[in-house]
């Protein structure tokens, strides 16, 4: 079985040390957090001492559309993303996950934005950090950058596929380049990006497990779920126990389909 992981901010009701203890108790060997986390130095040290790997960082995505505008705001966004790449290198985090654009009506992609992404990807390659582009709403924007940057990887987000692009499947297109996974569930209603635990919603996770098994990805089965009001009746301990059961169930299904193909 691939190792299990969960986003570090999955449960903010407990402090970092308590969260790490709960992760260890429930078999989570890896995690990730934002590349601009104000506590990145301290958290990286705590996780390292606990033997929990930091698989990747998620770059800031608020104002990501500014990357495509010929404005100083676009330059500022590039600087924030570049800082994230440099933080990954500084703390030996191999992958940074990046959104290409945001919203239903993002700006048209063009030379200004591509020049900025050129600089970002070049800096990442210089520092040995892999850029992974994540599926959001606009397949065309993602496909352009995946084609434009052949060394970039893909971050497969199961929840986004269901609630932002119903009926569309990303793994048949980019599965061979998968380097990160954001596993979470939702109601499969358009724009309902609930980020609940696997099997608590209506996402077709059986298909996701089958497609992941068919890909070369052997990295962490990483959940991007949060203890929201959906779990208000659960204690942190109960939430982590539920998370372990759900994520392990998905990992078992990946193993099942992989064994079938041998």
Language-model features: where?
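N-terminal pre-domain/capping segments
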Residues: 1-83, 89, 125, 153, ...
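Histidine-acidic metal/acid-base catalytic patches
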Residues: 1-5, 13-24, 142-153, 162-262
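Hydrophobic faces of well-ordered beta-strands that scaffold small-molecule active sites
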Residues: 2-8, 31-33, 54-59, 96-98, ...
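Acidic-and-aromatic substrate-binding clefts and catalytic sites of carbohydrate-active enzymes
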Residues: 8-16, 30-43, 65-67, 72-75, ...
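Residue-level detector of structured alpha->beta connecting loops
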Residues: 27, 51, 92, 128, ...
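Catalytic-core regions built around general acid/base machinery
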Residues: 42-50, 116-124, 170, 207-212
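Beta-hairpin (beta-strand-turn-beta-strand) motif
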Residues: 59-62, 93, 101, 186
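Active-site acidic/histidine proton-transfer and metal-coordination neighborhood
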Residues: 68-153, 163-165, 218, 237-246, ...
């Amino acid at each position: 079985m691939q190792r299990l992981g969960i986003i570090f901010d999955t449960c903010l009701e407990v402090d970092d040390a308590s969260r790490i203890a709960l992760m260890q108790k429930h078999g989570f060997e890896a995690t990730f957090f934002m590349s601009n986390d104000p506590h990145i130095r301290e958290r990286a040290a705590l996780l390292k001492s606990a033997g929990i790997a930091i698989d990747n960082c998620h770059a800031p995505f608020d104002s990501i559309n500014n990357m495509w505008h010929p404005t100083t705001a676009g330059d500022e966004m590039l600087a924030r993303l570049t800082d994230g790449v440099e933080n990954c290198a500084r703390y030996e985090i191999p992958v940074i996950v990046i959104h290409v654009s945001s919203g239903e009506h993002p700006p048209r992609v063009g030379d200004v934005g591509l020049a900025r992404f050129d600089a970002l990807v070049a800096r990442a390659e210089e520092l040995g950090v892999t850029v992974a582009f994540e599926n959001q709403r606009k397949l065309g924007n993602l496909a352009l950058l995946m084609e434009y940057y052949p060394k970039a990887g893909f971050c497969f987000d199961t929840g986004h596929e269901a609630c932002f692009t119903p009926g569309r499947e990303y793994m048949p297109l980019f599965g061979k380049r998968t380097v990160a996974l954001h596993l979470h569930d939702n109601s499969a209603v358009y724009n309902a990006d609930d980020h609940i635990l696997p099997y608590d919603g209506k996402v077709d996770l059986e298909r996701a497990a089958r497609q992941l098994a068919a890909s070369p990805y052997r990295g962490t089965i990483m959940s991007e779920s949060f203890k929201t009001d959906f779990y208000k009746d659960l204690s942190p301990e109960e939430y982590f126990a539920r998370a372990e059961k759900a994520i392990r169930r998905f990992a078992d299904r990946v193993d099942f389909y992989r064994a079938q193909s041998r």
